[in-house]
């Protein structure tokens, strides 16, 4: 007789259970990246038409009726959307791999959860940032202005991924450099002990 899913979840290693929210976000990031690829493949012309319509609807002062300026911004907007697709795939994959590495190291559940959430949420947020910047640029008349308007999303998202990745690097170094417990003299790895 098979065990129901919730019972199986309770029997998971504490470190893996702690990683599940971050792994869920990492998987969502992968689906976001793949979904954009499908949407772009099926609707590239419609998306570019929407960007052109947003540029046409912008106030006259934004582009000053300069067709060359409009083309530059529209081309760069499309590149930003492609970056969202690429970042979704790459950051989602990185988040899954690094989270599983942290679990395999036997890291404490709290540390595992923090790292996996930083990787998963950061990857998703940064991917969304590029898509949103691509859509905003056409109406604002500048990719720089679009990025600046979304700095509140880009900075913490990318920062979370970088900090979490550095934390994984530190954990790997600690895994190779056990420390001696002062009272017992036994080798310990305080951040890596799950129990």
Can you name each region flagged by the protein language model?
Residues 132-153:
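Interfacial non-cytosolic loop connecting adjacent transmembrane helices
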